[in-house]
């Protein structure tokens, strides 16, 4: 009985979501997709055969450091740069987005050859860095502190684990438009198309590269290849990087720390093996 009631509630929520869309999209039907870790995702089918991707944003974006206005600003710029899929309808305040459908698989399902990945992502970063700099900044220390402050319960092992990192000094001398979540699931096709801009903000490009290295499981060598491809595409050392390069290595522990805190937050809201695996992995990296 409880399972049936839950299913009916889900069906009603989908009908309500569909009815909220403008014509002709409200005449379609929704097919739930494997959801991201914070959003609800659907394939929308119209009677004409046209398809679209519908994303329902997380109802509490502030909890995860998401600024919807900045997400929309960066997304629109990314469409202009050929990085993001066109949008048919959006409600930026709620994070609802209806996008053109893409049949190409993401890199988690069908990654390009490993040797092709650094130049492809270098091209993504070069176009990303042409966008106007957002006013909202995602500085790793403040961002991680926000996550930590929102924890309902701080694990007993966390203070000792974070002490050395919080006593260190991270690079803070370069700010560029960043996506902050260029993981394989957010890259579609060989192009690639970039989706899920909700963590986008001004950020340090070193954190962006460190995040790529961690989420793609790259070696230091592959990360350095990406850096070289980026600089070659700009004709050498570029003023955007203040002549110091990306300084990505300094941000690897910050990627692990923020990933740990994010997983702890999610596990408080929705306990499960996926979040526990992320907690265990990032904790081990920081030990």
What are these regions (language model features)?
Residues 32-137:
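ATP-binding pocket architecture of kinase catalytic cores
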Residues 261-287:
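ATP/Mg2+ or Mg2+-diphosphate-binding catalytic cores
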Residues 34-46, 50-54, 165-207:
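Active-site acidic catalytic loop and adjacent metal/ATP-binding pocket
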Residues 68, 251-254:
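Start-of-helix signal in alpha-solenoid helical-repeat scaffolds, especially tetratricopeptide repeats
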Residues 8-25, 130-180, 184, 281-284:
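An alpha-helical support segment within catalytic cores of ATP-dependent transferases
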Residues 206-238, 253-271:
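Active-site activation/catalytic loop segments of kinase-like enzymes and analogous catalytic loops
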Residues 82, 125-133, 168-169, 216, ...:
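A general structural signal marking secondary-structure boundaries and capping sites
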Residues 24-32:
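Conserved N-terminal boundary motif of the eukaryotic protein kinase catalytic domain
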